[in-house]
């Protein structure tokens, strides 16, 4: 089974110096389970100069949940409650050589597909005339359930779900009902 968690549009205008801080996604979301994926679809050519996503290879296997922080021009934790079960993310940028960081350039329509615990970030858009846009769609699988823990994004919480409940609802629609694998 597959549920739609939510979708989102990311835009980095030309000459945007601000980087997207290193983070993993799942701590931001009111969902728990291992089967949580992001698909980030390029709408424009994406290069390191325009702010391509960078990933730490294998970091989803760390099973570490890092404290969510505000994005954009703001700093700190002002939009997220502190959760004692989370840890602060290490200073990856200062220690880049300590990590196996990978990235790929994308043409419009190409996709990054990654686990919600994969640590990733992106540089600013240093291009003078090129906008960098990406459309992200997040899906959950069989083991994903609603999670009422502190520190998640307010817009992704639901008044219609209780802790541990399956996500099937108008808020998190079922998009693939079969639990067996394709081809089985």
Per-range role (PLM):
Residues 1-56, 60-62:
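Conserved double-stranded beta-helix
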Residues 24-27, 40-41, 98-100, 119-122:
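Glycine-rich, charged/polar anion/phosphate-binding loops
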Residues 20-32, 104-105, 123-128, 148:
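Short histidine-centered beta-strand/loop micro-motifs
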Residues 65, 69-71, 108-113, 117-184:
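Non-heme Fe(II)/2-oxoglutarate
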Residues 33, 41, 92-93, 98, ...:
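Catalytic cores of transferase enzymes with a strong primary signal for eukaryotic protein kinases
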